Amino acid sequence: MTEKIYPISEEIKKNTLLDEETYQKWYRESINDPESFWAKHGQCIEWFKPFTKVKNTSFNDGVSIQWYEDGITNVAYNCIDRHLKTHGDQIALIWEGDNPYHDKKITYNELYEHVCRFANLLKNHGVKKGDKVTIYLPMIPEAAYAMLACARIGAVHSVIFAGFSAEAIAGRIVDCESTFIITADHGLRGGKRINLKDNVDHAIEIAARQNVRVDQVMVIRRTCGPIDWIEGRDFWYHEEITHAKTNCPAEPMNAEDPLFILYTSGSTGKPKGVLHSTGGYLVYAAITHKYVFDYHPGEIYWCTADIGWITGHSYLVYGPLCNGATTLMFEGTPTFPDKGRFWEIVDKHKVNTLYTAPTAIRALMGAGNSFVEHSKRTSLRLLGTVGEPINPEAWEWFYHTVGNDRCPILDTWWQTETGGHMITPLPGATPLKAGSATRPFFGVQLQIIDEQGNILEGEAEGNLCIIDSWPGQMRTLYKDHERFIETYFSTYKGKYFTGDGCRRDSDGYYWITGRVDDILNVSGHRLGTAEIESALVLHPAVSEAAVVGYPHPIKGQGVYSFVTLMEGTAPSEELQKDLIKHVRKEIGSIAILDKIQFAPQLPKTRSGKIMRRILRKIAENNFDNLGDISTLAEPQVVEDLIANRQN
């Protein structure tokens, strides 16, 4: 990792919201007196009834997290209504379609009307405060309308990434007991059609077998392609939306009422329903968006994330709209119709801030510089990265080639569970280092801890923990508070364990080194190894499977599968292809097996536990650091695995 320091640019210094001195002052205040700090910044949103209590949190037995607990507000009101008097005619949402010739611009006044109609349509179909609504949509404006409409009437949304399979959708429907689904006939991505309605139909059948019945499916028309239809259950959005009223009062919501459930991979294989509440989440999404992206009114802000991920929730929809920003939503991929698409969009819409994933950056870097050089990119002021640590080579390319040495790079570290940025540079306050997430955001107290639980001071490397709460923190895992405590607070008592490894350098900068648990970070998407292993062993040819990550030049981490076949089944290229297809069907298109190694046996301890540590080293080609293998029941298994490693 490089230690070269990139100073704060003079251009940014002239017009920044926060300089180095203010950052230090505010950070000290946020740690020494969090009540006062967050009381002040809690005013960044409008409250129907002001809060009198700020912070009521404990990471000890029982774990309880409450912020602004007696305040009453509404997320949709803050994202739309409060902007109407002063800038109702400003563009709220720019939509750029998969097809480069398709786009839309929606003002705040228009957004108000769309969301009110959508909210009334939900109400007309019996959806009420507290109901769970599943959203499985492509990146179209209606996806944002659906989220905001749920927030407006107090329904809890559960958005599912449109790349997930019917089985994955069903698991989420069953867990949150959702009886109402919003989907589209198809999605469009990279010029290809995705059968969303088909997936939903299959998911509903699977959920029904687990005694969860979906009563209504709202279908948004995207392609007009043929789909199956169930009369009495399915209804067309376009047929009913024009009859819905254009005014819908915003439901008064307690700050601690749930806003959404978002499922993320768990190390046990069953996805975890991360629950975020209303007041604290919105305050944190808004304040991080404002200061991390140094947001000034009138700027065009583009977060390339899908709404199916937390980044899409916090930094495509809720944070920017709460701040009255213009946010850009992109339906397509960075490489369609060619690898210059991102830069064309930047020029076309005069984008000032581009926030994207290292995976996309590495893929575009691999395409060479000519696509970038064919564009001007003069509107760009800031560049950001999210989803995984960015390697210094990709950082340097993004900075020099895309940003022409003048746009600070905001390498943000955070999680679905944190709701918003935790470690991040601030453009006017933080000198940069390529590959470092730099310093903690306000109110974030970090500790690096070794395997024995000792707190490490100064330069150190170990497990990253957070020792006190912040407003955007998840409140629980839906219907499973015990698992919430077990997952995040049992490893180090009284501390939130992130599951990430981290290094702190001599300047106090933090470098995220990757997951230390059984979660893979593939192209910025979290996949549980247990989830993939469970999918593999469902295949009739597979007796046993173990999955680990290995360094991948584009995706950050690749998926390496060690597979033991049933007695009498021979390995073949055909079977390999079938296993890849099978896992995609079970989990979704993001679960791609990069390497499959057929192994007659897996390395196990005498008690029968698979030694994944050894498999990880083999997958990484790191044969010299296998460590102690004397505890294995059959140590010779390791030699066979090394000899047959997939290059």
Curated annotation (Swiss-Prot):
Which catalytic reaction applies to this protein?
Answer: acetate + ATP + CoA = acetyl-CoA + AMP + diphosphate
Q: Which terms in the GO cellular component ontology are assigned?
A: cytosol
Q: What's the cofactor?
A: Mg(2+)
Keyword Magnesium applies: yes
Q: Name one GO molecular function term.
A: acetate-CoA ligase activity
Record flagged with keyword Nucleus:
no
The record's account of how the chain is modified after translation: Acetylated. Deacetylation by the SIR2-homolog deacetylase activates the enzyme.
Q: Which SUPFAM superfamilies match?
A: Acetyl-CoA synthetase-like
Q: Which residues bind CoA?
A: 189-192, 311, 523, 584
Task: Report the EC number(s), separated by commas if there are several.
Answer: 6.2.1.1
Parts of the chain that traverse the membrane: none
Which keywords does this chain's UniProt record carry?
Acetylation, ATP-binding, Ligase, Magnesium, Metal-binding, Nucleotide-binding
Residues recorded as binding Mg(2+), renumbered to this chain, are 537, 539, 542
A biological process (GO) of this protein is:
acetyl-CoA biosynthetic process from acetate
**InterPro entries cross-referenced by the UniProt entry:** Ac_CoA_lig, ACAS_N, AMP-bd_C, AMP-bd_C_sf, AMP-binding_CS, AMP-dep_synth/lig_dom, ANL_N_sf
Record's family?
A: Belongs to the ATP-dependent AMP-binding enzyme family.
Q: Which HAMAP family match?
A: Ac_CoA_synth (MF_01123)
Indicate what this protein is called per its UniProt record: Acetyl-coenzyme A synthetase
Originating organism: Bartonella tribocorum (strain CIP 105476 / IBS 506)
Q: What is the lineage of its organism?
A: Bacteria, Pseudomonadati, Pseudomonadota, Alphaproteobacteria, Hyphomicrobiales
